[in-house]
Amino acid sequence: MERWLIIHGVDFSGADSGGAHKIRIATRHGRQTPVQVERADRKGLLERIRAGVADGRPHLWRIDAPMGLALPTIEEAGVKGWRGCAEWMAGFAGARDWRSGLRTLTRQEPRRTCDHDLRTPMPPTNLRVFKQTWTFVCEILVPLAQEGVRIEPVVAGAPGMQTVVCESCPASDLQRRGWPHKGYKGKGERPREVREEILPRAVRAGLVVPESIGEQAIADEEGDLLDALLLALEPAPTVAPKEALVEGWVY
């Protein structure tokens, strides 16, 4: 009997409040199992990932946040490798301190190889996402890496590790699938219509969505719940280039 990979799609938050339960986690326990949705702050997300490690079952966490920086930025920081970059970032008191320190080194905001190849909306140091980048790396990935969790493709993890954490991006997924990838976030009838178009496509792709959750996803003007649901689908096969071993990759 096939052992199903438990997939968690996570719409992340880098808010100063610790996420304040704004993070959405959509979980699939099986191909024919209805998706389950919960809220968490960043501490709660970390606890959920650790609980998955402890249960010994195969878990894949697809998290919508940048897991690394572009090579030119890393070179400006004078560090080597993903771990060196992550430790350097964690040496700052918070996301704003890190961005201020980074801007004393460079004001350039280069995109990573994955940002180019997989068409993510913006680079990891952009004003709109830098908090997500710092909090994901420093509050989630650094402790997990220290605990032997596999972080694809930058940390191999401990032998026998069944839990994998990776970066994912709903916008990239939507473009890869040829689905509408713009205009589904916001107030008004047109964004709602786009959400109403996207969700049935996810269902046809294999996502079992309870009616109440589907209604919430359509009504959610920020698109957070829909993003989490999209990331609960299986990622497409991909081959990460050598740059990804330092910058990270989008799955």
Ranges and model annotations:
Residues E2-Y251:
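RNase H-like (RuvC/DEDD) metal-dependent nuclease/polynucleotide-processing core
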